[in-house]
Design a protein with these regions (language model features):
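Short periplasmic/luminal acceptor-recognition loop of GT-C membrane glycosyltransferases, typified by
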Residues: 425-469, 504-510
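Structural motif
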Residues: 426, 495-497, 516
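Ligand-binding "clamshell"
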Residues: 517-523
Length: 604
């Protein structure tokens, strides 16, 4: 769509042209940098989880066996790349700032990825608008400042950049594009396993079909068979590479497949069953994008080239609705049934394991190229007024997402764990195991700095203790929120305290005190001005290794400490040593002024 003709002597406003990507990155730094410098993401739900893993890598880079949770578990059960970068940075700037820095890098990668991905379908100008939109996405702010899903925000942009190179490889057979695509894909896989298993496919299928549609565009003469074969080559090499780079992960998964009772999660509920679910999973992450849905459906169905992208968005949006529709549960259940029939396994429906807020983020990213076309249309017609309205809507969307945790807090009031850590690290107390009750995610903070081991932990997929896997509850520290299942799981652990060497229990919620007193624990000390109490049980023997879990071999530790982070370094080196070919274009002076009389003046 061409822009309206400009009257003589009138400047072309910046929104009427492509916004330089460097400016978009500057916007991302201005918008998110101050929040990250304030360490606002450090209060998000999973932040302490990532810092816990990073702290272990900082001290034991080539030994992923961590004895601080679940009486011992392997960190090869979670891809390590961004946590390993945190570990490296933490030696210079500390763990908290390292988390903020790594999160900032992910945020800066996102507009680059969205721009490259959007350019497959839309103009440079529209792609720059999509990149701006990615900075202000409500779903991004929800993941960064509320959920703390660092891995999701790292992996997604890497896949988007990789798929832009895959598009070049599929159409043009450029070997260097294939190499870059593979390196970036390996790096993305090293960041997050769920994004690997779902988003990589969701993002890639529209690109492949668009490459087929575009095989004759821009003077190319690619054949249908050639595009399909090159796509198969990329897919095959990707599968082989992911198996190698994440080999210790696959070994751990084979030794200990996930066999747990489903743990309740809000993203699997009907989002219209409670008002806060509607706000938390629809209004906050989607924000102003909801207003663009009619245009997305209209434009996506109307234009042939946009249909693969639209159907990918539509599919992902249905998953983003979680348990609101039966589609995700039915499809994932059917897939599990097929796998069980082929392998003879008894795999549980993945619906009961997944959380679906990340699908909203992925769907939003796929919607941005189409929404950018709407932005172009509005700005061409209404000029700076449209720019102001669109900017306001984007800013309001992000502001609401950042502010939402204040009005719907995910943590209790802050409290200090320093006295708890001090107790565990002195007088040989670390010979015994401990448990926290009512600590929430602060449990991970204790785990980072205490030398003692706990029977609890925040990573549900790594749990192997039968007292935890047979009940449908998550962390023991939050037992009461899981009803009967949570309390029964806690009671089972207390019953086997001798077996686990569980001597110390730190309680921040009086709700648990009657249960502890009945089970034989006694209150001995008070910390944090009465906020935390210590309960001790006499006669408990020192902790010893348990038979649950298989420590990785030394070779697996070496592979885990080199290949995942090495893939990201390789991708960075390739991008620096082999820059992309740039199209030759005319350099225009700024501000640009029309010197000739237009044929038609802009209607006002």
């Amino acid at each position: 769509m061409s822009s309206p003709t400009i009257a003589p002597g009138r400047q072309v406003s910046l929104p009427s042209r492509a916004i330089p990507l460097s400016w978009v990155l500057l916007l991302a730094i201005l918008v998110h940098g101050s929040l990250l410098l304030m360490q606002l993401p450090n209060d998000s739900y999973d932040a302490d989880f990532h810092k816990f893993f990073a702290a272990h890598y900082a001290a034991h880079w080539f030994n992923p066996w961590n004895e601080k949770w679940f009486t011992g578990f392997s960190q090869t059960t979670y891809p390590p790349m961004e946590q390993q970068w945190m570990a490296l940075f933490s030696h210079i700037i500390g763990l908290n700032l390292a988390y903020s820095l790594v999160q900032l890098i992910a945020i800066l990668l996102l507009p680059i990825g969205v721009y490259r991905y959007a350019r497959i379908w839309v103009s440079e100008r529209a792609a720059s608008y999509a990149a701006i939109g990615s900075v202000l996405l409500g779903s991004l702010s929800s993941l960064v400042y509320q959920a703390g899903q660092l891995s999701t925000t790292w992996a997604a942009p890497l896949y988007l950049i990789a798929l832009a190179y895959f598009y070049e490889w599929a159409r043009e057979a450029r070997f260097m594009a294939l190499i870059k695509a593979l390196a970036l894909t390996m790096a993305a896989a090293s960041a997050h396993h769920v994004t690997l298993l779902f988003a990589s496919v969701i993002f890639a299928i529209p690109v492949m079909f668009t490459a087929i549609i575009d095989r004759k565009r821009d003077g190319l003469d690619a054949t249908l068979g050639g595009v399909i074969i090159r796509s198969a080559v990329y897919a095959g090499l990707t599968i082989a590479g992911v198996i190698v780079v994440l080999l210790p992960y696959w070994v751990a998964l084979m030794h200990n497949p996930i066999k747990q009772m489903p743990i309740p999660h809000g993203s699997r509920e009907n989002f219209f069953s409670q008002w806060w679910l509607t706000v938390n999973y629809i209004l906050v992450p989607w924000g102003a994008l909801l207003l663009a849905l009619p245009f997305i459906f209209y434009k996506g169905l109307k234009e042939t080239r946009l249909r693969p992208l639209f159907f990918g968005f539509w599919f992902t949006m249905l998953f983003a609705l979680g348990g609101t529709t039966p589609f995700p549960r039915a499809l994932l259940g059917a897939m599990a049934g097929i796998v069980n029939a082929i392998t003879g396994k008894n795999i549980r429906n993945p619906f009961d394991i997944l959380t679906f807020e990340r699908f909203c983020f992925w769907a939003s990213l796929m919607a941005l190229p189409i929404v950018a076309l709407l932005a172009v249309k509005l700005i061409d017609r209404y000029g700076n007024k449209a720019s102001f309205v669109l900017g306001t809507l984007g800013a309001a969307t992000m502001a609401w997402a950042v502010a939402w945790p204040v009005y719907h807090p995910i943590h209790d009031a802050p409290f200090s764990t320093s006295e708890v850590v001090s107790f565990l690290n002195r007088d040989g107390h670390d010979k015994f195991r401990y448990l926290t009750l009512g600590f929430g995610s602060k449990m991970s903070e204790v785990g980072i700095y205490a030398n003692a081991s706990s029977v609890d932990g925040e990573y549900n997929s790594a749990r192997l203790l039968p007292e935890m896997t047979k009940y449908g509850s998550a962390q023991l520290t939050n037992s009461k929120y899981y009803g009967t299942n949570g309390i029964e799981s806690l009671r089972a652990v207390l019953k086997h305290a001798d077996q686990y060497g569980l001597k110390y229990i730190f309680v921040r919620d009086p709700y648990y005190e009657p249960l502890l007193a009945f089970a034989g624990w006694r209150k001995t000390e008070v910390y944090d001005r009465g906020n935390v109490t210590l309960w001790v049980k006499d006669g408990i023997p020192p902790a010893h290794p348990t038979p649950y879990g298989t420590p990785p071999t030394a070779m697996e530790g070496i592979l885990w400490g080199t290949l995942p982070i090495g893939s990201s370094i390789l991708a960075l080196v390739l991008m620096l040593l082999f820059p992309d070919r740039r199209r030759t274009r005319e350099t225009l002076k700024f501000p640009m002024v029309e010197s000739e009389e237009p044929l038609l003046r802009e209607a006002r």
